[in-house]
Structure formats: structure tokens, C-alpha cells
Amino acid sequence: MAKFEDKVDLYDDRGNLVEEQVPLEALSPLRNPAIKSIVQGIKRTVAVNLEGIENALKTAKVGGPACKIMGRELDLDIVGNAESIAAAAKEMIQVTEDDDTNVELLGGGKRALVQVPSARFDVAAEYSAAPLVTATAFVQAIINEFDVSMYDANMVKAAVLGRYPQSVEYMGANIATMLDIPQKLEGPGYALRNIMVNHVVAATLKNTLQAAALSTILEQTAMFEMGDAVGAFERMHLLGLAYQGMNADNLVFDLVKANGKEGTVGSVIADLVERALEDGVIKVEKELTDYKVYGTDDLAMWNAYAAAGLMAATMVNQGAARAAQGVSSTLLYYNDLIEFETGLPSVDFGKVEGTAVGFSFFSHSIYGGGGPGIFNGNHIVTRHSKGFAIPCVAAAMALDAGTQMFSPEATSGLIKEVFSQVDEFREPLKYVVEAAAEIKNEI
């Protein structure tokens, strides 16, 4: 039996209706098979740069920048022997021959997509097994393939896994995961939020609605892990996931379509308020001179509508600029304006607005520091909104036309080449909506 009475209509990224009257819980990370698969996939997927390993050994440049060890060069044809190396690594990584291990070569053997078997995570406290097991397997496979001596084996390890464990992170490694190392988490339950915006944008090939969807899935699934989306707050987070990230009732799409040509942040707010009135989400509580004060009997639904409006405003504003840099200002002033327009709480009850103040400063004010694409939901500046800010940043970076120093191409090239090959990472909206439609009668 469903916990909540809410039902939504689900659409694709072109605004076409896919399924009507889907129970809200069909989009829950606890129920939706596609979301479960995406989360598990992100935990167990590793990108391996075989060409990078070969070049690191050939030049003896290992362990990060300014680290070249003269006389330790190894000229190994790793790319040319990629098939043999990958097969040997797979044999070490897998638990049984018929498990869900996947080792797939890409780009003519220059890259490898590795998916560590689920059985390894059944006996793991967290997700470090993916990079560490993968790295160890490829190190051994390369050593065995080329009969590397015991005196040169440490160079192979350094070329694959970098300076670790002398460094906390895998500095200079030629492997990559979307999840950062556990030591960098701001607190318990933050792992799925600790994924750079640019990684999400790269994996979805800069498709704006898909990037927003994947970011929302990660952020809102983290709320279940952190204990935020429990009890009285579960419905609020599910509605946010549905409307802001999954384009429920085509709300985001409709707002962008209506405002895309000549609209502004303000016109998106005006349309959003009108839509909320039509749908009975809000009502006029008090009429003053030239001003209306609105009220609602359903704050969670109002928050979802406001969050969808914020996503649309970001797409309209940053899309018009073809630049992501102003996303922090959109996050700030959309919420400031909607509070004044309605008298109702802004998105995430003020937490997005508060986040945007610091985000503006640290992304391009006096301090600078880094562009929007290098932030994540675990970052000390942007962690404060519980799942409603970072998806908008992902949408903004997807719309950026190359204005950023820290672009997805610059920071996330290996992620793009490898993770975008996984259909559910590249088109999460499609697969989550289809899965919700399949299980709707089971809720």
C-alpha cells in the first residue's frame, strides 16, 4: 500500500508524455529499480586510462605533477596488449564466472570500463573496493603480461594508482571514479553528494535535463542515506525529486518552453505562481493594496513547485547567457524574488538562498577559487541545501558553451569517455521514468 496519495504524470526529455498517474513512491530510491541500478553502478564502476598508464611508464612521470623519476622509464606496449591485460584483470576482479563483473575496452584499447562485482560490496563497509580492487588487478595483469621485474613493479603500481598511500587521494592515478574518496566526506551519508558537477555533466554528454535528473537522483538518494528523507520529510524529498529532477507533470519543460525565447527569472516566477494557483497548490490568503499574500495547505508540494521553477529559471537564464557563471545569482535572486512575490518560503525553506550567497562569493567574487562545475553537494560552500541546489548547477554547466576554465572537458574527460558508455548514466531520466511506469501497479 502506498504511503502517499500523490500521483504524477511522467515525461521524457522532449516533453512527450510517457506514463500518466504514476504513484510518487514509484520514483523513490527505495523502490525504483533504475535508481537502484544507477546508484549501485556508480559505486562499482571505474574508468581505467590504459594509454595514460603506458605514457606514465614511458616517461617515468608518476605520482602527480612535478614528479619524474629519471632512469625508471619502462617502454611497455600496454594499449597494444590491452585485450590480454583486460582479460587477466577481469579474472582477478570477478568472484564467479557468471557474476556481474564487466571489463570492457574502449577507444581501441586506450580506455577500459570496469564494473566490480556486487559480491565484493556485500562484504564491504563502503565503496573503496571498486578503485582499489581494479587498480590492484590491472597492476598485476601488466606485471604478468610483460614479466616486469620485482625492482620495477613499484613503477607499475605508481602509474596505475598514483602516489597513494603517501597521499590521501590517488594522486596522479590513471583510474577514475565518480565517487570521491571517503576521507573527503563532510559527514556521514555524504558519499553520493561528493560527485563533482562536471562529472555528472560529462556522463550525460551535456544534455541539460539528463544532467539535472542524474544530479537530482544522487542528491535526493543521499537524503535517504543521511536520514533526512524519513518520516515527516520523506514526501518533501520525493516531491522535489519528481518535480525538480524528473520533470513531473512536465512542469520544468513547460516553464522553459514558455520563457525560453524572451523570458527572465522574473517571468518564470510569474508563470510558476500562476501554475501553482491553477493547480490548487497555493491560494490568495490576503489582498493588500496592489499586493497579494499567498498561503498553502501543502508546503511540501509548494516546495516542489518552487524547486521546479528554480530549475526552469536556471535553464532560461544560463541558457540565454550560454554561460554557467551566473548560476549562483539565479539561485539567490530567484528565491529572494519568490519570497517577496508570494510571502511563502523559498526553495528548501531558505537553504538554497543561503547556499547561493556563499556560492556566489566562492565561485566568482573577491575570492574566486573555482567555477561552478567543480562544486558538489559535499562541498562546504554548497552542502547546506538538502538536494535542491546542485541539480541546478548541473543544468547550468550542461548549458555552458565553453566559457569556463574548469569545464567538463578539462576536469572530467576520462569520466565522459567511459561513464557515458553506460546507458543509465547517460540517460537517467529515460530509464527511471520507464522503471516507474513498470512498477506503478505494485505501489
From Swiss-Prot:
The keyword Cytoplasm applies. Methyl-coenzyme M reductase activity is inhibited by 3-nitrooxypropanol (3-NOP) in vitro and in vivo, by oxidation of its active site Ni(I), which stops both growth and methanogenesis. Is also inhibited by the reaction product CoM-S-S-CoB. GO terms for molecular function: coenzyme-B sulfoethylthiotransferase activity. It is found in: Cytoplasm. SUPFAM superfamilies: Methyl-coenzyme M reductase alpha and beta chain C-terminal domain, Methyl-coenzyme M reductase subunits. Pfam families: MCR_beta (PF02241), MCR_beta_N (PF02783). Coenzyme B binds at G369. Keywords: Cytoplasm, Methanogenesis, Transferase. It comes from the Archaea. Coenzyme M binds at Y367. Component of the methyl-coenzyme M reductase (MCR) I that catalyzes the reductive cleavage of methyl-coenzyme M (CoM-S-CH3 or 2-(methylthio)ethanesulfonate) using coenzyme B (CoB or 7-mercaptoheptanoylthreonine phosphate) as reductant which results in the production of methane and the mixed heterodisulfide of CoB and CoM (CoM-S-S-CoB). This is the final step in methanogenesis. Neither N-6-mercaptohexanoylthreonine phosphate (H-S-HxoTP) nor N-8-mercaptooctanoylthreonine phosphate (H-SOcoTP) nor any other thiol compound such as CoA or CoM can substitute for CoB as the electron donor. The MCR reaction has been shown to follow an ordered bi-bi ternary complex mechanism, in which methyl-SCoM must enter the MCR active site prior to CoB for a productive catalysis. Belongs to the methyl-coenzyme M reductase beta subunit family. This is Methyl-coenzyme M reductase I subunit beta. It comes from Methanothermobacter marburgensis (strain ATCC BAA-927 / DSM 2133 / JCM 14651 / NBRC 100331 / OCM 82 / Marburg).
